[in-house]
Amino acid sequence: MSAPPLYRLTDERRVSLVRDVGQVREVLDEDPVGSCMVACRVLDYGVDPNAIGGELWTRRRVDESLCYAGANLIPLRGGPDDIAAFADKALGSPRRCSSLVGRAELVLPLWRRLEAGWGAARDVRDEQPLMALSAPPQCAGDPAVRPVRMEELDAYLVAAIEMFIGEVGIDPRMGDGGRGYRRRVAGLIAAGRAWARFEDGQVVFKAEIGSQSPTVGQIQGVWVHPEWRGRGLG
């Protein structure tokens, strides 16, 4: 028997904390590419907020409305009333997330309600394609690209910082001098999720597996050294 949802009142809209991992997995399985960031957490740790680094919200039934609220706010399913309820819940709670991620038809209306309370976004990418391969690539991989070793952290970190500044527009070393970002990058290397091509000790190409479910791996942090661009490395 499914565990009953735990209801919370948010401006007369009932928002519940999801506790049934089976229902969540059914929803995530219907969109394995779009839900990869959430699926990798749920499949490993279930729906316990402490284990997955955030809460899973629903307003009615999980197959009708679902939103992940953690370091990222990720609406996965819902109509206009559901999105409004999720926004009100986020506005009424201490802010945790730094970005909204997901399908534009869900993220953009959610952000329109949040913007008045949270202030202007640093960047709104309303047309950012989500690309996926459904078959093996038609070109051969670069044999020089390999997993990064821990002793190469310093060299790899230089490229990672350049990538972050170019992609996000801010320096990841702000605030704590880069200690937190260094730990994050070191964690990716330790997990075997950081890949690069080195030439004379310098990174000329890098990419990372940010999230990984049993069926989908999300490639992020792709970067090519400026002097090596235009050669097909990317």
Show which residues each predicted segment covers.
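Conserved beta-hairpin
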Residues: 40-71, 142, 186-207
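A conserved beta-turn-beta hairpin within the catalytic core of GNAT-like acetyltransferases
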Residues: 74-75, 211-219, 229
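Short amphipathic alpha-helix that is part of the acyltransferase structural core
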Residues: 2-37, 136-174
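Conserved glycine-rich acetyl-CoA-binding loop
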Residues: 221, 225-234
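Acyl-donor-binding surface of acyltransferase catalytic domains
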Residues: 60-64, 68-143
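Structured helix-beta-strand junction loops
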Residues: 30, 34, 96, 191-192
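Short beta-strand micro-motifs in enzyme catalytic cores
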Residues: 55, 127-131, 193-195, 217
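Flexible, substrate/cofactor-facing loop regions flanked by secondary structure
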Residues: 138-217
